[in-house]
């Protein structure tokens, strides 16, 4: 019986030491810095920055944890997962000129119809690849401008007003849509938070 009590006391002491070891010295009760490094939900940020009509018509795509492309909103619900992955990999990513290894994280939305200039993207560049991302998105804008210049005047004006900016938070954003100034302001506010 005495041996059981000693054993129980040793277990209780070990548990107490384990709990004390879980604390951090100098803890202030404030969130740790890992909370500040929590990844941002770029898909949700794009969704919230644009109009309800755009959310209805244009999907927002990104790369899933499994390495395959995935999408939400717009017409994405009409696709099977493999079809969606193939369309994004073979059509949309080449339109944005984003290659593997350029982005640590991203979300984007594009029109693949040749009668509309529409492209939004938030890209967190991979280490040392910021200028590559800026160049890729600027090439997208230039392509849109060339496509629309002698075709559809209203869409050409949208492409001419497109913006590619590197934000203080490190993300590179592309805004090529109607009311681009408002969308850009919305993106900047959300990404600064």
List PLM regions with ranges:
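Short Gly/Thr-rich strand-loop-strand
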Residues: 130-168
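Early exported N-terminus immediately downstream of N-terminal targeting peptides
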Residues: 36-91, 97-100
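A short, solvent-exposed beta-edge/loop patch
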Residues: 112-113, 122-124, 155-193
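Mid-length scaffold segments of soluble, non-membrane domains
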Residues: 93-139, 145
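C-terminal motif of bacterial Sec signal peptides marking the signal peptidase cleavage site
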Residues: 17-21
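Bacterial N-terminal signal peptides that target proteins for export
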Residues: 1-10
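Bacterial signal peptide processing site
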Residues: 23-26
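Extracytoplasmic/secreted envelope proteins and their assembly/folding machinery
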Residues: 39, 43-46, 120, 130, ...
């Amino acid at each position: 019986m005495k041996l059981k009590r000693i054993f129980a006391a040793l277990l209780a002491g070990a548990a107490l030491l384990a709990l004390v070891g879980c604390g951090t010295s100098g803890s202030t009760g404030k969130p740790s810095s890992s909370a500040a490094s929590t990844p941002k939900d770029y898909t949700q940020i794009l969704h919230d920055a644009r109009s309800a009509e755009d959310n209805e018509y244009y999907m927002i795509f990104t790369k899933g944890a499994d390495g395959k492309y995935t999408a939400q909103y717009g017409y994405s619900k009409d696709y099977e997962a493999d079809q969606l992955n193939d369309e994004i990999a073979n059509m949309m990513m080449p339109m944005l000129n984003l290659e593997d290894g350029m982005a640590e994280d991203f979300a984007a939305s594009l029109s693949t119809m040749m009668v509309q200039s529409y492209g939004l993207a938030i890209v967190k560049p991979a280490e040392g690849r910021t200028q590559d991302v800026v160049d890729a998105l600027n090439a997208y804008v230039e392509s849109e401008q060339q496509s629309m210049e002698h075709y559809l005047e209203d869409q050409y004006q949208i492409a001419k007003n497109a913006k590619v900016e590197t934000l203080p938070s490190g993300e590179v954003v592309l805004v090529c849509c109607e009311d681009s100034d408002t969308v850009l302001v919305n993106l900047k506010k959300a990404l600064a938070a």
